[in-house]
Amino acid sequence: GFFPGQALALVGEKHAAKSLTQAIITELLGGRCARPYQAMLGNTAFNADWFEAEHLCIEDEAPRTELRTRRKLGVGIKMATANGGQRCRGMYKDAIELNPFWRLSMSLNDDAEHLMVLPPLDESLSDKIMLLKCRKHPMPMPTGTPAEKKVFWDALMLELPAFIHHLLDEWSVPDAIREDRFGVRYYHHPAILEAMSAQSPEQRLLDLIDMEVFRSDAPGPETMRAIDVEKKLTRWDS
């Protein structure tokens, strides 16, 4: 039956094997992936390709950082991770409801622009996404040429059966992080949360207020209505 699972966001510097990790996840889930980003944002009404894959993969997408767009992505993440029945619609086909098995992953760089692709982590979303910090490390085998990359990938694939056996038959979720709904408690890396907070609309508004109130020629403390603060911050010369 249906069992929900959190989305996985891999966030880190360039060349930190984020896309490689997603490729391994695809193989672990059966070897098929779909690209849900555009449909989640409402740029297309068709999503039948999602139902041909187990891994919903978001990577190397043109970043969209508008708050409305980020909230749409958040709705899509909640839908893909927590809902059993899913609406499937193909081109020139009637929509039907199906019950797929999906796991969603995202990879993005940790610069300010790409971090703002992530949706705001409100109470309804925070437990449905993992935020993991990725760092660059030397590969265990040479990967400087296409031929070397293929040898490395083939070696990884040879290890997958043993890795799957370890996950299914030898390893179990520690009690300290076990959680009933998703099986494991969500985790948000503190550095990612801090960086997201620094770029949030609320923090940017606070920065604007600080720039206005604490500038060198600003008057002393004063009481103002919210509408007056907005007018003051949006003056052409402020």
What are the language-model segments listed below?
Residues 46-97:
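Conserved nucleotide-sensing/catalytic segment adjacent to the nucleotide-binding pocket
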